[in-house]
Each structure stands twice: as C-alpha cells, then as structure tokens.
Amino acid sequence: ILGQGKGRKRLIVEAPENVARQGLRIAFLKDSALPYEIGDMSYILELRHRLEEAGHTTFFSEKSLKELGMDVGRIAAFVTHTEADAWIIIAGSHPVLEWFSKYSTPSFALFGRRKGIPIASAGPDKPPVCGSATRHLIALGHQRITMIVQKQHRSPKPGGSAEAFLKEIKTAGISSGTFNLPDWEESKEGFVALLESLFEHTPPTAIILDEAFQFHAAVYFLATRGIRIPKDVSLVCMDSAPSFAWCEPSVAHIHWDARPVVRRIVRWIDNVARGKEDKRQTLTKAKFIEGGTIGAAPKANSRNRTINSDPTTSGH
C-alpha cells in the first residue's frame, strides 16, 4: 500500500514474492464502547494475536460506531483522520459498510448488514437458524414472541435474522407488530424500560435476544421480579459466549465456529499486505442449540407472570 500524498487515494501495488512485506497498522472499529461485548468475543483476542504474530500492529479505534451515532458523515470524518492501513468494522450498518466499500483504505466487514455490498466480509449464517429457532418456539405453543435487536437490524427494514423471524411468525398465522420487533433506546436504562413495558400487562411467552450481554441482563431482570425461566418465559440468545458454559439451566442459543472467520481475516490481511485485491464474502455455518432456557408456552388458563404479579400466588 503506497501513499500518494495527503488527500489522495492510497495505491495498492502487488509486491513481488521475493520482497519482504511490511507490517500493517490495522484498526478495529467496534460497534459499541462497552468492554464486556469484546470480552464475550474471545475470537477477537485470538485474531489480534495471529495478526501481531505475523508482524502487524492492531488497535481499537478511539471511538465506536455507536459513539459516532452510526452516522456516516461523522464516521467518515473520524476514519479519515485515523492513521490505518486496513480497517476491520465490527457489526456495521448497511450505510456505514457501503461507505467503507468505497473508501480508499482496504476494509473488512466482520458481521453487519453487508449483503449486496462489494466489501470483503465474514460472519455466521444466522437467518436460517433464527428461522429454525422461531419454528421450534411456535411448535412449543408460543404465540407471543418478542425479538430484541439493535436498531440497525430492524431499521429502515428488518435485517436477515429479524426478517426470518417475522416470516416464520407470519407463516404460522400469528399477527405481527411492534410487540414482536420493538423499538428501544440502546442503553441500560432503555433495555430495562423495554422489559418493564413488555411485562406490564400481557407479557411475551418467549424472548429472542441479540447478544450475550443482553441475555444475562434479561435473566437478572426477570430473576429480581420473580419471573421464572422457562416456566413463565423462554429465552433464546442469537449468539454464543464462553459464559454460557457456566449457566444452569443451559442456554438456548445460536452457536457457530469462529475459527474459520479468524482464518479468513488473517488471509485477507495477508492479501492486502501483498497488494492483492480481495473482496470475497464468506458465511460460516451456524446451528441452534436447544438449551434449558426454553420450554412449552404457559397454558392458556395459566396467566403469565407480570412485573406486578405476586410471586407467591401466580404462575402455577
């Protein structure tokens, strides 16, 4: 990668095989500033280790996508003033990834709404598995199912997993609306407010959550209010985390092998370092793990417990 002066695009030139490659400065652009989200993604640590072993320098950018409001203009200004030879964008929105696909510095989409965008990418193929998990819940008698996902996965139109979820609900003849895919403020306070509103009157019998930290937060919320899992409500997480191995009952979740994703990014960086254009997109197989956090929907004559219910008298 050769610089051509300030304000001019960098030139990608393929290096001869006998020429030693220089290490690249690789920036990771997180979707959130929350440290425990990266803690759940142990494969990021493995990826950084592999890249640094290969002689590259890796770092997390000072700002996250959410801190920049997932706003293309703000992100563009931030990125262009950050010195990096390659960018790895974690869970970017469609407009953000579209901008990176046209940016002069090589960029890689790790997850995110990348479908139809000419950008190198990798991630698990979750939509079919999300559909399977939804069908399983419906087969267990669940009619009131809520999926909690980030704004980029529900707006301006539902993303792959949310779309698969809504399709299965429609196929089952269940009417859908904001109860199934609610809008919410993406913060601790917003998450609690959403759960309180869901359980105030006619609560869901099953909740599908986007990320592991949300799953744990939901479990804590429900436990402190006497709402039992899975007797009163079933929970499914659309991701996996090392912490799930310590959970009893076992967590119903979507599992995928991160090793192919790590290998793909290492190969991409190697190609970038050699000056080879690489915009290949790969999907990793995912599968639904039926854990102990899901069960049959509460019987029609047995009222779901709400946050106003008395734990000593309801939900038998």
Positions of the model-derived regions?
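N-terminal helix-turn-helix DNA-binding module of bacterial transcription factors
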Residues: 1-20, 306-316
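Amphipathic helical "hinge" segments at domain boundaries
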Residues: 8-76, 85, 163
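Periplasmic-binding protein-like
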Residues: 27-29, 79-91, 146-149, 201-214, ...
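Short beta-strand elements in bilobed, periplasmic/extracellular small-molecule ligand-binding domains
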Residues: 51-67, 147, 162, 166-191
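Flexible loop/hinge segments that line or gate small-molecule binding clefts
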Residues: 90-129, 213, 239-251
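Hydrophobic alpha-helical segments within soluble ligand-binding/sensing domains
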Residues: 118-148, 188-196, 215, 255-274
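An alpha-beta-alpha
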Residues: 133-176, 280-294
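Flexible loop/turn connectors
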Residues: 195-315
